[in-house]
Structures are given as structure tokens and as C-alpha cells.
A protein has these predicted regions:
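Terminal-region recognition feature
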Residues: 1-168
Length: 168
């Protein structure tokens, strides 16, 4: 009985989610109960060692970065993090990265590339932070250099969209 009920639920969910219009799809991606990057980091990886700072200006808490073990193998983990409640969302800038976040990920991607460590990224952002301060600190250049770095990597990379996938 439980098995048939689960099958029925699965079929109904598949039917619902395969017929969403674009706005409904956006609302699902933005749903506050979706698991965030921290959830995946805590539940998929062992021995996560967080690394922070861009070595120029400061730390961007909208992106979690660090080395961890996945099935016993070393990986670099990058996760855009929106936060779970109002305070953590403000602290994490609602998942909108600043130049410091892009420079931090570039620094760590280059390190992973140097030591032949694969990269796993979790994407969940409405887009890059559009503030004046971010622009003054080189937001556009940081985004461009991040894209360039990704294109030049020699290590395997996996990018998993877990929510929004806005530009930046």
C-alpha cells in the first residue's frame, strides 16, 4: 500500500513539475525551504575545511569555499549561500556575491588546479551584487576573471544548480 501511494505521489509531482510556466519555475527555484549550499556541504562531504578571504579586501560570506573529502577523495567545494533566516540572509547578502567572493573563488580554483583537485560548485544566486561599492571594487572585472579562470581549469568541475541561477 505504501509503495503504491509513493508511486502515485511521484507521478503527480512529475506531472505538476513538468507543466510549470516560467514564473512558476522561478518561484520553485526561489522557495525558501529549498536546501541551501550549507545543507549539501554538511551532508555530502567529510572533513570540510572552510577557507575565506580574497587576500585583497576581505571576506564575502555569500559564497562558502573550502576543501573536503567526497567518497574519500579531496575536492574543492564552492557554494553560493543565501542563508536560512533573516539575519543569516543579511550576513550572506542574500546570495549575491561581491568582488571579494569572485576573487576568493578564483584563488581557490587556481589552488585546486595546481594540485589537481576536482571542483564541485553549488549555484544558488539571484545574481551578482549591484551595489556602488561592489562596482567601485571591480565587480565586472572580478566576474570576467572568474569566468576566464573556469575556462582555463584543467581539473574536472561539476556545477549543480540548487536554486536560482541568476547572472553573475
Amino acid at each position: 500500500k505504501i509503495s503504491s501511494t509513493q508511486t502515485e505521489i511521484d507521478e503527480k509531482l512529475k506531472n505538476i513539475y513538468s507543466n510549470l510556466d516560467p514564473w512558476q519555475t522561478t518561484m520553485v527555484a526561489r522557495h525558501e525551504d529549498r536546501p541551501k549550499a550549507k545543507f549539501f556541504i554538511d551532508n555530502l562531504f567529510d572533513d570540510f575545511v572552510p577557507l575565506s578571504g580574497d587576500r585583497y579586501y576581505g571576506e564575502d560570506k555569500s559564497v562558502l569555499t573550502g576543501f573536503a573529502k567526497f567518497n574519500g577523495k579531496s575536492v574543492l567545494v564552492i557554494g553560493q549561500e543565501k542563508g536560512e533566516d533573516l539575519d543569516s540572509r543579511i550576513e550572506r547578502n542574500f546570495g549575491m556575491m561581491r568582488p571579494e567572493g569572485y576573487r576568493k573563488t578564483i584563488r581557490l580554483m587556481n589552488l585546486a588546479n595546481k594540485f589537481n583537485i576536482p571542483i564541485i560548485s553549488f549555484i544558488d544566486t539571484p545574481g551578482a551584487y549591484p551595489g556602488v561599492g561592489a562596482e567601485e571594487r571591480g565587480q565586472a572585472e572580478a566576474i570576467a576573471k572568474s569566468i576566464e579562470c573556469c575556462m582555463e581549469l584543467k581539473v574536472p568541475t561539476i556545477a549543480i544548480i540548487i536554486g536560482e541561477g541568476g547572472s553573475g
